[in-house]
Design a protein with these regions (language model features):
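Cysteine endopeptidase catalytic domains of the caspase/legumain-like
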Residues: 1-170
Length: 170
């Protein structure tokens, strides 16, 4: 099992820092990628604790952020790092279900991306976060859960455009 801690992604051969994975694709190192989105999806644990659900009262407050555009792009522009869970917590997978198997984050991401084919990546990721937070299918013992996290430095909206699958005739 691969685990990600504060120091990086633990592998069989050692630890790899997420920044070491991203660095070659930054705008100061990969000129042909300037202005193009670079997406890194890290499906791994980020610690040894189980996240639990807490009760809350939902406020009716909406915040709007101003958006500004730069004429030149900063070194870290157009990079998005997507983590299956927040720092310090487990990332879960289902291994014994008859309906589906696999990592909760990846399953939720695929399902939401299919439901929202015209949405940009940050809308999709927000919907994935919501899905993992409220859907009881992504819980253990009605309490333990997983919450993804992303760090986005996108200078424009990014849309996933999938090809329609052809139906196979029997």
């Amino acid at each position: 099992m691969q685990l990600i801690f504060q120091l990086g992604i633990a592998t069989q051969d050692g630890t790899i820092k997420v920044d070491d994975l991203v660095r070659p694709f930054r705008n100061d190192n990969a000129f042909s990628f300037i202005g193009k989105p670079k997406i890194f999806i890290i499906q791994a644990c980020r610690g040894g604790r189980s996240q639990v659900k807490e009760q809350y009262i939902e406020p009716n407050i909406i915040h709007e952020a101003d958006s500004t555009v730069c004429a030149r792009l900063p070194t870290d522009a157009d990079i998005i790092k997507i983590f299956a869970t927040t720092p310090g917590y487990y990332s879960y997978r289902t291994v014994d279900s008859t309906s589906w198997r696999g990592a909760w984050f990846i399953q939720a991401f695929i399902a939401v991306a299919r439901e929202l084919p015209k949405s940009h990546i940050q809308e999709i990721l927000t919907a994935v976060t919501h899905e993992l937070a409220i859907n009881p299918e992504y819980e253990i013992d009605g309490e333990k859960c997983q919450l993804p996290m992303f760090e986005a430095a996108l200078s424009k909206l990014f849309y996933l455009k999938g090809k329609r699958r052809k139906k196979i005739k029997n």
